[in-house]
């Protein structure tokens, strides 16, 4: 049995992890993946010695990326193909079932505290019930380990049962359905596993009761997982500053000719000034830009007329009105904001290419992060393949796939813990 990782379980550096390739040795455990996305999280399991026996992803573009990297059979719609997946997996002595249901309706932005307590509201979005489909697969296949990952609100969301007769929180439904398993459910920040971003997520780990109790306890405690890094980025610039500089003002400056993922959207005219007038390394917002006419910086945020000289502050986010005047754009202080240079990155999201979104601007350069930088901050190894067919429209779809993924460093460390559990 094991209780924690030892010094021999340490990996030398974050850079070494990014340089990892798929293992060529015989697989050490098996897994199936539901709501697999592009297979980014599954890639970490493969790096740890896992063999994917089945995946399920409804979007053809994401499924294509999964196939290019994982090579497992991929089913489409879990609701309509669930029976086929169960038939395929039964009798295979599955070690792990991992499920990452769609999270949009559970997210902080779309699930205010009051709505989190409203099961009727939850019932209006059919995606909220998809985890029930995963539970049915788990109950019928009976893998040794079941792993759910989702946004922080996921476990506490009140929801109705599929027949509408029972109301409870998601974590209560999970525990009730998996009664033959020991359970651990919690919200954690993946930075504690050495991912260089603030990424708070719900995780729920279930270990079948026939697994040794002490061994199961260590598997369910992320602090005990092997694969910790001896060297890791202290801040965002430590992680990404080795890449060529980019600038969003001109097309020839906005892309790296040697890396199709290292490119950024263009911002011209006043939009570029909203970014360029934010001091580098300041962590400030364009709402705080000094007046470009007189240099005064005392005008309060969300105001676009200088209180000293009375001129329009075109370098702050605004909308031009029919009469020629401007009004401030409605938004939050964290929109149009540089990331802090001396901290790890904020959460990588599917909206990484939108500079108006929350904390999306590079700490020192005049642009958003590139998809390559987002991939690094999500701890996605360089060996992960991005087929050309999925890199259209300046890789916006790649950005979505990156933002919604479980960081492979997390699943790699979980996979290493599974290997220790199964070989104890």
Predicted features along the sequence, with ranges:
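Conserved Class I S-adenosyl-L-methionine
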Residues: 163-183
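Conserved S-adenosyl-L-methionine
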Residues: 75, 152, 180-192
